């Protein structure tokens, strides 16, 4: 649909068609989903070559991720990476990295540090600026920027040997 608010009305049976059309046009197709495991999200995950799960240090977020990882393990899916975003809720630091790994029963592939917290992120978002291309952000947050670059390369790497449905 042209109006994103109507996206929830799209039947899951159209997702494979959308993926096939997008794969013919683009080298990389990004699909942003939400935590609820409905027909559309499950179908999108089935047809994805690689999946990036972004989690925070939030208990509800971690509980949802634990369930999703359990489903992936039960279905023998290995085509995912996990990014821990510590820069979003910088006040929520009551769980250590060890605690988070224990809760989700999985390793964390990439981490964004608390230092990557951008106070005026709305300003950049509204102007449409890509943070990884901003010189001052690159200068002050080089470690996190390099982490994101490595993650992006890992997401599009063909050597994973992980196939999505055709």
PLM regions and their residue ranges:
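Conserved beta-strand segments of the P-loop GTPase G domain that flank and frequently precede/overlap
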Residues: 1, 32, 53-57, 80-86
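P-loop/Walker-type NTP enzyme "switch/lid" segment
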Residues: 1-24, 120-130
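P-loop NTP-binding core
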Residues: 1-9, 71, 77-80, 107, ...
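Loop/turn-to-beta-strand initiation segments
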Residues: 24-31
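Well-ordered beta-strand positions
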Residues: 28, 50, 106-110
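Inter-motif core of Ras-like GTPase G domains
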Residues: 38-58
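Beta-strand-loop-alpha "switch" segments that mediate conformational coupling across diverse proteins
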Residues: 88, 97-133
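NTP-binding/hydrolysis catalytic cores, primarily Walker-type P-loop NTPases
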Residues: 123-166
């Amino acid at each position: 649909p042209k109006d994103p608010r109507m996206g929830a009305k799209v039947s899951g049976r159209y997702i494979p068609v959308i993926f096939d059309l997008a794969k013919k046009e683009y080298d990389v197709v990004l699909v942003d989903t939400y935590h609820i495991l409905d027909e559309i999200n499950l179908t999108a995950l089935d047809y994805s070559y690689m999946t990036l799960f972004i989690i925070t240090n939030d208990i509800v977020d971690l509980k949802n991720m634990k369930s999703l990882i359990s489903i992936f393990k039960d279905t023998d899916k290995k085509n995912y990476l996990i990014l821990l975003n510590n820069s979003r809720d910088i006040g929520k630091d009551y769980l250590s990295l060890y605690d988070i790994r224990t809760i989700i029963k999985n390793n964390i592939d990439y981490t964004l540090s608390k230092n990557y917290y951008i106070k005026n992120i709305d300003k950049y978002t509204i102007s449409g600026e890509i943070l990884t291309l901003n010189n001052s952000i690159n200068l002050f947050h080089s470690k996190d920027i390099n982490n994101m670059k490595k993650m992006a390369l890992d997401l599009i790497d063909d050597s994973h040997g992980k196939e999505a449905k055709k």
